[in-house]
Amino acid sequence: MANIKSQKKRILTNEKARLRNNAVKSELKTAVRAVNQAVEAGNKETAGEALVHASRKLDKAVSKGVIHSNQAANRKSAISKKVSALKG
């Protein structure tokens, strides 16, 4: 157990950040999964809407510092490639 006051404070803030990060990452997985399911089902409209929703979630995660901007760009690129292949 930490003895120094600042260490005790960091333990609390790190735990809060960990919980928030896990929640945001879970939302990201759900959003990306929705895009993939729509693509597999062949539903163009739903896939497009889910793509916009997932892109927004990814951008928000970057702004919160949960994931790196390059990782968000890679994920957005991958799902948009699937959706555009469905439309094309």
Swiss-Prot record:
Keywords per UniProt: Ribonucleoprotein, Ribosomal protein, RNA-binding, rRNA-binding
Transmembrane segments: none
One Gene Ontology molecular-function label: small ribosomal subunit rRNA binding
GO terms for biological process, alphabetical: translation
Tagged with keyword Aminoacyl-tRNA synthetase: no
Gene3D superfamilies assigned: Ribosomal protein S20 (1.20.58.110)
Keyword match Ribonucleoprotein: yes
Cellular component annotations (GO), alphabetically ordered: cytosol; small ribosomal subunit
Family annotation (InterPro entries): Ribosomal_bS20 (IPR002583), Ribosomal_bS20_sf (IPR036510)
Annotated function: Binds directly to 16S ribosomal RNA.
UniProt-listed NCBIfam families: S20
Similarity section: Belongs to the bacterial ribosomal protein bS20 family.
Protein name (Swiss-Prot/TrEMBL): Small ribosomal subunit protein bS20
Origin species: Renibacterium salmoninarum (strain ATCC 33209 / DSM 20767 / JCM 11484 / NBRC 15589 / NCIMB 2235)
Lineage: Bacteria, Bacillati, Actinomycetota, Actinomycetes, Micrococcales
